[in-house]
C-alpha cells in the first residue's frame, strides 16, 4: 500500500478480501481484489456492487454566507437547492480554470456538504471563507459507500422504506442496519443512481 495519511474504516475488511489497497486522495483504497476482475465488473453492471469511495473529500460549509460563497466558488447556482437536494458542479480558480469537480448537498437552510475529488477544492473553499461568516470543516470520519448496479435499489428497498421514491440528485437522512446514514441518489455510472 502507498503511504496514506487517511484510513478507511473498511481497510481491514478490504485486505481480508484480497486488496492491497492503493493510495487515492491520501487514503488507502481498494481498487481491485484477488478475484477475477471481469466477474467483479459484470456483477456491478448486471446486479449490484458496493464500492468504498471514502477517499472522496467531504467538507461541511455552514453559516449565513455559505450559499453566496458556494455560488462564487462553484459553477452552479446553489440558491436553487433546498434541504435534501444536491447538484453536480465544477470548481474554478480565480482565473476561471478548472480545479475540481464536486457534488454540493444542501443539508439545512445555511448548511451544505461539498464532496469533491483529488483537486484543490478544499483549499478553494477555505480561501473563500476567510473573513466571512462561514465555518469550514473537513470531515474525515464520514465514509462513503457507493452501492451501484441495476439491483441496488431493490436491496435498499428491503431496508429503507420509500427509497424508490427518492428523486435523482436528492438525499435523505435515515437509519440503515441501526446506524444513522445519509443516502443520496447521485450515482452517474449509467443506472438509476
Report each predicted region and the residues it spans:
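Acidic, proline/glycine-enriched N-terminal capping motif
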Residues: 1-92, 97
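Acidic, low-complexity central loop/insert segments
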Residues: 100-193
